[in-house]
Design a protein with these regions (language model features):
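Membrane-anchoring/interfacial helices and their immediately flanking loops
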Residues: 1-25
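Extended N-terminal export/anchoring regions of large proteins
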Residues: 16-17, 55-58, 213-216
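Membrane-helix interface "capping/anchor" motifs
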Residues: 24-35
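Membrane-embedded hydrophobic alpha-helical segments
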Residues: 33-111, 115, 122
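N-terminal leader/targeting and pre-domain segments
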Residues: 104-106, 111, 115-122, 127-133, ...
Length: 485
């Protein structure tokens, strides 16, 4: 095969120029779109090679020659490559258009939500309860929308961030003062004023006062409905058939709130921070079966009616009830990791029967009637300087490590041993603790002392309450009862 120099030279020159065009496009001609450069270069190259290459190699264009077939093949190849590039460009354009449309849709959806959010927040300040309630339902729905919207907001963290903003607004509404709440106790009973006694027979003043009472009573009831609707919506989303709910990972700040209505968080899961610092519950507060897996702050809270935390699992995080005030409190079967009840005050019943503590601080707490029967203290049990004005029942309570009753005051004899039918329920103290970990030196002013006796285990002597059992926490149940001497 012989090479014709002229067509070969022209072909090489065109090819070099085409390659240089591509290089200049890459480094310099940024304003010219790649698609048009590639199309132009390939069209020129394809045509040049189809026309010149057969000539350069002196292909036979006769009837039986291969020149025409080679040229046709090069033309088809060039056309195919150009077609593929064109299809790729169309796909790119369609993808960009789709991405743009998706972004426009996302912006539209988010803008529409934020517009609804702004309107709903404004509705919360309306003087009409129905409008405020509508704002609440809108905000609740928006939180659910954000959490479920994986399409426009793929990041779960971002969805929760948007939801937390709305949760903060709902909590802020709960925290906001309502003037009539201070008169709730008066407005909750029927109108009792007398025409003659209170108004000297002035019927106009009597009727005006009665109408004002009815108006305020209705306004109080409406506001209760709005706020209880918020609490109900939160509670329903804090649980899912025993599992955490869709709203369990949000922080809740109810600090210094006046709950002038019954509060129900039964079986709720709080998997983030929950703040009830300084709150006042004027009606019953129900937290039975609730779970707090992060920090739960009830410090300086005031429970003026019944506080039910029975079966609550206040674990993983710390639980702070320091300086809280209770009338009647039920913590039976509750579980705590680190519970701080220091300086708490229990005006009437305090039921901690069968409760479980890893660390418990009741220092300087005040009890009227305290039931710690069958409670378990795995680590610290600090009752130093606590005051018990009535029953203090520790029968069948179990202390595994550290028990401190130093400086405590008992107005009645503390119970560490109690007969229950044919059974004698005795407190248990672990022999694995150091003898000095048990301190029963109550206050010198205490009318009743904790009577102690010496017991020995494997040659180590302990002083524990009289009638109590010294047991080995690593041994069998029979050893627990039979190893005191």
């Amino acid at each position: 095969m012989t090479i014709q120099l002229l067509p070969a030279s022209i072909l090489v020159t065109i090819t070099v120029i085409a390659v240089l065009c591509l290089i200049f496009r890459w480094f310099g001609l940024k304003k010219v779109r790649s698609f048009y450069v590639w199309i132009g270069v390939l069209a020129v190259l394809g045509g040049a090679w189809a026309f010149l290459f057969p000539l350069a190699i002196t292909a036979d264009f006769g009837k039986d020659g291969d020149g025409a077939a080679l040229r046709q093949m090069l033309i088809y190849t060039t056309g195919g490559v150009l077609g593929v590039i064109t299809l790729g460009e169309n796909h790119r354009k369609n993808s960009l258009e789709k991405a743009k449309n998706d972004q426009d849709h996302i912006r539209q959806v988010h803008a529409e939500r934020r517009s609804r959010y702004t309107t709903a927040v404004e509705q919360l300040s309306s003087d009409k309860a129905s409008i405020r309630l509508g704002g609440v339902y809108t905000l609740v729905g928006l939180v659910d929308e954000w959490l479920a919207d994986e399409k426009t907001t793929p990041s779960l963290e971002e969805r929760r961030k948007e939801g937390q903003v709305i949760i903060n607004n709902l909590c802020a509404y709960i925290r906001s003062p309502f003037l009539l709440a201070e008169r709730a106790e008066h407005l909750d009973i029927p109108y009792t004023k007398d025409l003659q006694k209170d108004f000297d027979g002035d019927i106009e003043k009597f009727d005006a006062d009665k109408r004002a009472f009815a108006r305020d009573k209705a306004a109080l009831g409406e506001e209760r409905q709005v706020r209880q609707s918020i609490i109900k919506a939160i509670r329903e989303r804090l649980q899912d058939f025993g599992a955490p709910g869709s709203w369990s990972n949000f922080d809740y700040d109810f600090s210094n709130t006046l709950f002038f209505y019954s509060t129900n968080f039964i079986f709720s899961h709080f998997d983030a921070f929950s703040y009830f610092h300084g709150v006042t519950f004027t009606q019953n507060a129900y937290f039975s079966g609730a779970k707090f897996t992060e920090y739960a702050d009830f410090s300086k809270a005031e429970f003026t009616k019944y506080a039910d935390f029975s079966g609550a699992k206040l674990f993983t995080g710390n639980t702070n009830f320091s300086q809280a005030e209770f009338i009647r409190a039920n913590f039976s079967e509750a579980k705590f990791t680190s519970a701080d009840f220091s300086e708490a005050e229990f005006t009437w019943d305090a039921d901690f029967s069968e409760a479980e503590f890893i660390r418990a601080n009741f220092s300087e707490a005040k009890f009227t009637s305290a039931d710690f029967s069958e409670a378990k203290f795995t680590w610290d049990a600090d009752f130093s300087e606590a005051k018990f004005t009535w029953d203090a029942d520790f029968s069948e309570a179990e202390f595994t490590k550290y028990a401190d009753f130093s400086g405590a005051t008992f107005e009645e004899k503390p119970i560490f041993e109690r007969a229950l039918g044919d059974k004698t329920c005795k407190a248990r103290f672990a022999c694995k603790a150091a003898p000095e970990d048990y301190n029963f030196e109550v206050s010198p002013d205490s009318p009743y002392k904790i009577e102690t006796e010496e017991k020995e285990y494997n040659g180590v002597k302990f002083r524990i309450p009289k009638g109590a059992i010294l047991f080995d926490p690593d041994g069998s149940s029979e050893q627990k009862d039979d190893n005191d001497s």
